[in-house]
Structure formats: structure tokens, C-alpha cells
Amino acid sequence: MAGITGVMNMKLAARPSSGRHSRGCRPAVVPSAGKQMLLVRRHPPGSASWPTRATGGGGGGVPAGATAADSSGQAKEEEEEDRASRNTSSFEPSIWGDFFLTYSSPLATSSAQKARMVHRAEQLKKQVAKLIAASGACSLYHRIHLVDALERLCLDYLFEDEINDMVTQIHNVDVSGCDLQTVAMWFYLLRNHGYRVSSDVVFAKFRDEQGGFAANNPRDLLNLYNAACLRTHGETILDEAASFTSKCLKSLAPYTYMEASLASEIKRALEIPLPRSVRIYGAKSRIAEYGNQTEANELVLELAKLNYNLVQLQHQEELKIITRWWNDLELQTRLSFARDRVVECYFWMVGVYFEPSYSRARVILSKVLAIVSLLDDTYDVYGTSQECELFTKCIESWDPAATGGRLPGNMKFIFAKILDTCQSFEDELAPDEKYRMHYLKTFIIDLVRAYNEEVKWREQGYVPATVEEHLQVSARSGGCHLLSCTSFVGMGDVADQEAFEWVRGVPKIVKALCIILRLSDDLKSYEREKMSSHVASTMESCMKEHQVPLEVARVKIQETIDETWKDFNEEWLNLNTNSHLPRELLERIFNLTRTMVYIYQQDDAYTNCHVIKDTINSLFVEPVSIT
């Protein structure tokens, strides 16, 4: 679609022209007003009861001489008086409530039990490290398959140096005499690790005169399909491979005649291709599938199970921290118009980094996402146009005294909580890390400016004339700029000031992330949102720009998403080969993109959180059976 290149050159905090408001679409991170919740409160599998969140909130906030009930009642009375003149939301209460405050895993019955798990995992790590070292004498296919298995099982972070050495060796292998399955896996592995390998050179010999490929079985098709999803602009052979393999894989349905694990892989890949999937969300399924493979290694399998359970215990402790923080803010007792989704926020951000070493970064990022969600609902549901304008100016000032008597009590309350939360981040950072907060605040301010623009659009019923104009603001209001920056804030020394300056400039890979998310969200949500009052989406701008009906606009938007993925892949390769940024940082951006794809592939699983309830339960509650 023409015009998107202009968006790729947008700058942070570039204010839209005041004469014609440049679109302020709902953030991609969270949905807009008018979205109807399909949520049903359900008990988790295997539990006898399900806790609801206590209405009294966490500690603090009760004046001397008053009871928690008095404070809660007063807040409720003030809210009810205010609510009559405002929009209302239909968001359901949290599914999870305080569940993780009291949940005790069957794996954590004693410190001795956990110590035994850790000890056994350390033994297995040493044995698997020897296995990796010995694989250098094995076939290329065997080495690729081993690395692929370790990555799918979320074990690669335990063997980072060993895997990097092996990938370097694999890169130097001549694959001209290999079969399609091996070549496709080789290409996928190297592209995924940031190596710019030629597609024409390795895949040309597998093409036929009809434009197809010499794929002899479903596994060949699947591997070629995954490889093709890492294509960049101008790679015609991979465009053809993607089209060919997609059609062939779909034609194989219902897959009843093939191995169950392969059938599951194909179904998942057609929903979300492997390079765009969130590994930790599907790790438990892949552990089970790996265990059913004839070439599975028992040491790798046992380590995968133990490591999954140990990581799960770490995540459970962090969920206690997150839930307690959310309760202590007392947001759910005063702000009934907003979504209570703190567990879903944490689930989302675990996809950005699941590894135990990123605990501080993960907790900070989850809290910021919860704040983003609250801000979105404040602009989208609660505030009037005038109030949102004042609220934006208050946040721009970053001064608690700026609220004066002009803002509603709830907006003052929210502003104070944002300041308190950011101060807590700063207190947690080391002296030589505190500069990071400047970048975080800058992106929060830019986000609320974009939110404020969308309020103006909604009030005016304005539809941007082009998709490019729309994205000048809606790509910013998606929150991905802020989350990209925040993903660095809690990391270690690897995130230096050069990295923050890089992300402050909103590099092309982050812009591509923002566009992919905005368009994917609008593509999924248009039919639902048009039934209620909402901010114009990119779908409407596309129809207006090209004077086409809805179905044609859908095709154009999908084409733009596909082309933007090529931009993303190109930048992934450029940054891995031509920049000084550590891959550890670049992975945060790629993983953030993957989580966005997952959430919006599910038709906004953040708001419609029943969609991911079972996945959350599987990831954070149910351990993997070791036997």
C-alpha cells in the first residue's frame, strides 16, 4: 500500500498538526471503548473454588480513625455520583483476582524439594552441554535439529555460548548437496539468528517450471513455509514459496492421516508462523511433542521438564509481587470503568522475556503495561474532551501540583499513582541506571499526547483521509514505542545509554512493530467496533483513501501487514550484522512483536481474556509431569 514509508520516517513526540487532527486511534496494546467483553468468570481446571479480588484493595490509603470499609464506601459513593454523567464500560471483573497471592504449587511443598530439583537440573545441564559439544562430529541435519529442539523447548538460554558457536559452524557449511528439509531448516535457523543468507542460492534448485517446489512430504512443506516467513523485500523465490506452501499445507486438512505432533505443528504454523510465535506460550506442548519423537534425547527431555517447572516457580513468585502491587494501588476499588487485567499484563510480558535472570525487567514492564491499560481506559471511556486535554498537560508537566482543582478526583488519583509507580522504578534502579527514567517518562508523555488526539477524532467523527495519516498517530498510540523502551529499563548493563538513545529515535524495526500491531488489531476488530461509538480505524481510512468496499480494504490492509513484516525482517538482519546493539536487546523488540501477534490473533485476548485463561493456567499453575 502506498504511503506507509512516510510513517516509517516518523519521529518521537512529533505533534500532529492542530488544523486537522492526525488520528489518535485506540492503543494497540489495549482496546477502545465500546468493545464488548465476552468474558465469563470460570474456575481454573482442577480447582475447587475461585477467589475474587477483595474490594478493600491492598494496604495503605485509609485515613487515621477510618476503617477500610469507610474508605471504600466513600470512594464508591463519589464514583457513583460521577458515573451518571460519563460513559460506562462493560468490562468484566478479573478472572484471576488474588489467586496468585495464595496459590501454592505442588512443586513448592518444601525448600528441600526445590533444592533437589535445582541440583538435578544442574547435573542435566552439564550432561547436555557435553552432548552439544559432541554434536560437532554429527551430520548437519543432526546439529540443526539439536539447536532447533533446544530453542523450541526454551532451553537455549542455558547454553547461549555453545549454541552461538554451533550456529557459526552451521553457517559455514556448504548446503548445496542437501535435501529441501535440511536446507529449509538451515536457512530458518540462520535468518532467525540474524545471518543474512541468500535465498536464491539455496532454494533455486528446488523450484519446478510450474512455480512449485520439490517438497516430497508435509515436513518439507512446513520447514519451507517457516523459512519463507523470514523473507525480505525482493525475495521473489520466498514470496512464491510462502504462497505455494501455505496452499499445500491448507489442502492437507484435516490432517488425520499424519502423525499427531506434525498435524499440531502445521495447524499452529498456519495460525502463527513459527518465527512469529512466542516460544514460552507453547513450550509445554512442544515438550510433549518432543517426548513422542523417535530421535528425542532423554537428557534433553528431562531437563526441559525440570527447567519449565523451575521457571514456573519463579513466575509464580513474581505474580505475587505484581498482584500485591496492583492491590496496593487501590485502582480496582475506585476505577470501575477500567479493566482489571494485571495477570494478563504479566502473561503478555513473560513472552518478551521468560528467563529467570530478567525478573526485575519483567516486573517493571508488566507494571508499565498495566498503567498503559489504565491510561487507555481513562481516555477512551472516562474522560471528557476537556478533561483529557487537562490530563495530558498534567502528565506533560510531570508535576503533582499541576492538577490543582481542575481535574476530576479520579484523574488526580491516576496521575498520583503513575508518579508513585515511576518513582518506585527509579528507587529500584542503581545510581548509574537512573537516567533510564528520563526516556521512560518521555515515551509516556508521547503516548498520552496520541491518546488525546484520538479523543479529538472521536468527538469530531473524523476519518483520516489516508492510512498513512492515520498511522502518524495510531502507530504511536499503540504503546509499542513505550513498551520497547521499557523493556530495556530493568535490564542489566547490556542496556546502556546508547541503547536508550537508539530506541528514543524510534528505529525502523520499532516502527514496523507499531504498524503491524495497529493494522492487525484493526483487521480483527473492525466488525465488532463498528457496532458502537469508536474512533475511526485504518480500515475506514483505507476505504476512504481508495474508494473501495470493506472486503477490498481488508485485502489491502493484509498486503500492507505482509509488506511491513518484510521491513521488520530486513531491519532484523541489518541490526544483527551492521550495528553495535547486542542481540540480547534486539530480541526484546522481536519478542514484543511476537506477543502482539499472539494477543491480536486471538481477537484481542487482552480484553476478551477468557480466550487465554487456559493458556495462563497451563503456563503459571500446572507443572509438567516429570514421570
UniProtKB/Swiss-Prot annotation:
Subcellular location: Plastid, Chloroplast
Induction per the UniProt record: Induced by wounding in roots and leaves sheaths.
InterPro entries: Isoprenoid_synthase_dom_sf, Terpene_cyclase-like_1_C, Terpene_cyclase_plant_C1, Terpene_synth_N, Terpene_synth_N_sf, Terpene_synthase-like, Terpene_synthase_metal-bd, Terpenoid_cyclase/PrenylTrfase
Cofactors required: Mg(2+); Mn(2+)
Biological process according to GO: diterpenoid biosynthetic process; response to wounding; terpenoid biosynthetic process
EC number(s) from the headed UniProt entry: 4.2.3.111, 4.2.3.-, 4.2.3.113, 4.2.3.15
Binding-site residues, (2E)-geranyl diphosphate: 339, 376, 380, 518, 521
Stretches the record annotates as Disordered: 13-90
GO molecular function, one term: myrcene synthase activity
Sequence motif: DDXXD motif, positions: 376-380
Record pathway: Secondary metabolite biosynthesis; terpenoid biosynthesis
Sequence positions that bind Mg(2+) 1: 376, 380
Transit peptide start-stop: 1-53
Keywords, in A-Z order: Chloroplast, Cobalt, Lyase, Magnesium, Manganese, Metal-binding, Plastid, Transit peptide
Tissue spec. comment: Expressed in seedling leaf sheaths and roots.
Cofactor binding notes: Binds 3 Mg(2+) or Mn(2+) ions per subunit.
Similarity comment text for this entry: Belongs to the terpene synthase family. Tpsb subfamily.
Oligomeric form and interacting partners: Monomer.
Function per UniProt: Component of the volatile terpenes biosynthesis pathways. Mediates the synthesis of a blend of monoterpenes. Converts mainly geranyl diphosphate to alpha-terpineol. Also triggers the biosynthesis of minor monoterpenes including limonene, gamma-terpinene, beta-myrcene, terpinolene and 4-terpineol.
Protein name (Swiss-Prot/TrEMBL): Alpha-terpineol synthase, chloroplastic
Species this chain originates from: Zea mays
